[in-house]
Amino acid sequence: ARQSSDRRHLAGFEDQAVYLDLAEPESFPAALKDCRYLLHVAADYRLWVPNEAAMRKVNIDGSIALLRAAQHAGVERSIYTSSVAALGLTDDGSPADETTLILPAHHVGAYKRSKYDAEQAVRRLAQEQDIVIVNPSTPIGPGDVKPTPTGQMVLDAARGKMPAFVDTGLNVAHVDDVAAGHLLALTQGRSGEGYILGGEDLMLRDLLALVAELSGRAAPKLRLPLAPLMPLAWAMERIAERTGKTPLMTPDILRMAKKKMFFSTHKARTELGYAPRPARQAVADALI
């Protein structure tokens, strides 16, 4: 963890914690000393950033430097946490998998671009060291102390702060299943291979309805068309560039919503023994 990070999720493990910052390669050797395995889970996960170069420095340069440092330190195997954001999408909305064709148009926004470029660099590294790649979808569940953008959406919906939705879809995974998938990749995964750690495909309206049901609120019923929102999103982004405050929506977020991010976990199930639970459980645990 970084020295500046919120470490509430490490309660009870403080004596085992080591400190590392992807933007500070000089912190790597001490953190990797006597380390047999590395699970590189960290990333700059934001849907909007005022400075894309800073995100790329962490997600790409920092990741490659860390994996090279792990090799130098004698680490036997590394697990690199990529994202489904780095994968291709289908034109018809059917579930994509690890072999789906990747097109530049799929990588909308700084985060997706950085994760795609990082994964490609990691795949090249995997030709010379033992690295397994995992691609989590949308983890939801307990312990999201920051919270992540997805966790914030669930909290906002539970508080009645999302009266409307756009017509899009996503794959929801319980965060504990994603964690278990990392350990399965460590013991069962093939070096150089990638594995989607997903869960259940849901339309956004159905996810919000599930959050509403479990939190005792009415589900949002207003569906907003994407095209009329684009000028508003553009204006919000211009304001954010001046203030530095994260906008409610951006043109890139709306462009991403045009594609359903549905994914198959068949490869992880068959090769790793991955067994995700229903989205209902993930949402219920996120609301505890």
Which ranges hold each PLM region?
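A conserved pocket-lining segment of Rossmann-fold NAD(P)-dependent short-chain dehydrogenase/reductase
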Residues: 103-106, 152-173, 177
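Conserved catalytic-site region of short-chain dehydrogenase/reductase
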Residues: 47, 84-94, 139-145
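Conserved beta-loop-beta element that borders a ligand/cofactor-binding pocket
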Residues: 82, 120-142
